[in-house]
């Protein structure tokens, strides 16, 4: 949890009028599972006013099934991975997973991110037309330099 996450939460709550719940994913699709110590360190960052949930839903399609009618607040770098075929068995498999966003009424609030010295935003991502309307972007004007992070 860093200042960028807090800023994203605050901007998202202001834009949507909804309360934010942080998700801690113990088993991410492109990272090793979190250790007990990593989970404890993560949870220790929250205070009693923060809302959080822990899952093992490594893909956003799984999160969609767990949390229907939600708005997921993510960075553009994360949205790129949602459409990366390396996380699926085939293009057809990826499209079936993406369709779950429609099935479960999922929306994405996408924040621009600096990745390898280039700022990417929602407009830079090739989003399947069947879910394009489910994505809303916050662009560079909302980006805070102190929380830039190259990944």
Model segments located where?
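Nucleotidyltransferase catalytic core that binds NTPs
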Residues: 1-151
């Amino acid at each position: 949890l860093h200042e960028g996450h807090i800023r994203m939460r605050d901007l998202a709550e202001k834009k949507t009028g909804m309360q934010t719940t942080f998700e801690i994913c113990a088993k991410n699709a492109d990272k090793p599972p979190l250790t007990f110590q990593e989970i404890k360190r993560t949870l220790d960052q929250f205070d009693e006013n923060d809302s959080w949930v822990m899952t093992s839903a490594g893909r956003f399609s799984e999160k969609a099934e767990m949390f229907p009618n939600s708005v997921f607040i993510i960075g553009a770098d994360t949205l790129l991975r949602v459409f990366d075929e390396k996380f699926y068995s085939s293009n057809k498999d990826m499209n079936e997973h993406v369709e779950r966003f429609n099935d479960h009424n999922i929306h994405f609030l996408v924040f621009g991110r600096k990745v390898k010295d280039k700022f990417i935003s929602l407009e830079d991502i090739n989003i399947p037309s069947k879910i394009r309307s489910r994505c809303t972007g916050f662009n560079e004007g909302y980006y805070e330099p102190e929380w830039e992070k190259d990944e």
